């Protein structure tokens, strides 16, 4: 009888070992998938040609993830408010962007994308009706650097991009002005 129970124990140990090896293999395969995306809250600084030399602060949130090796896709949302033309015009913008970034190394990325830019121009000291809202599609080009803070968990993300929107037209003065701008953002990319 002890030979039969030894065979059962040996078979149970063998099955346990195979199950442990399969679980370990599955865990090793799933680790890259589990960290496939990042959520990136950020603060940015924007410089517009008609911003009176001022730098506007913006706030953003992005989701970024790999789509194929060395290529990441990103969806982003941001918000900024600034004064233009000697404080005569208050501009509020909330762009929604989609970007593709080529990552030749894990630390650097370059690329660009498209965005939907909702812009409201308000004229202070006038009725609330004295505002003009427009929606434009624009393109952006840029790049960035990521530096690990806590490997596999969080990294610092520094991004620079040029946004091309062309001429902004308003029914209120100024009738036309250049809407392009440079923006730099610093964020923390949290992996999930």
Task: Locate each region found by the language model.
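Compositionally biased regions
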Residues: 3-6, 17, 156, 186, ...
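Gram-negative (and chloroplast) outer-membrane scaffold detector with strong preference
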Residues: 62-158, 162-164, 184-190
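Short N-terminal segments immediately surrounding and downstream of signal-peptide cleavage
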Residues: 36-53
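Individual transmembrane alpha-helices with interfacial aromatic-anchor signatures
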Residues: 174-182
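Solvent-exposed loop/turn segments connecting transmembrane beta-strands
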Residues: 48-56, 85-89
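Short catalytic helix/loop segments, enriched in acidic residues and glycine
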Residues: 58-60
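Extracytoplasmic loops and strand-loop junctions of Gram-negative outer membrane beta-barrel proteins
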Residues: 44-46, 124-129, 169-171
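Cleavable N-terminal export/targeting peptides
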Residues: 1-38
């Amino acid at each position: 009888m002890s030979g039969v129970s030894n065979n059962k124990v040996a078979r149970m140990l063998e099955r346990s070992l195979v199950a442990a090896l399969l679980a370990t293999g599955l865990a090793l395969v799933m680790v890259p998938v589990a960290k496939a995306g990042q959520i990136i809250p950020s603060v940015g600084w924007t410089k517009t040609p008609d911003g009176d030399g001022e730098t506007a602060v913006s706030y953003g949130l992005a989701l970024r993830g790999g789509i194929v090796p060395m290529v990441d896709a990103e969806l982003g949302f941001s918000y900024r408010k600034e004064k233009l033309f000697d404080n005569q015009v208050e501009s509020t913008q909330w762009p929604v962007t989609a970007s593709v970034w080529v990552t030749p190394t894990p630390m650097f990325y370059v690329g660009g994308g498209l965005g939907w830019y909702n812009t409201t121009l308000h004229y202070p000291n006038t009725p609330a009706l004295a505002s003009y809202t427009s929606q434009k599609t624009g393109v952006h080009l840029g790049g960035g650097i990521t530096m690990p803070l806590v490997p596999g968990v969080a990294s610092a993300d520094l991004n620079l991009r040029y946004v091309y929107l062309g001429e902004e037209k308003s029914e209120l003065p100024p009738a036309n002005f250049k809407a392009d701008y440079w923006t730099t953002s610093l964020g923390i990319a949290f992996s999930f």
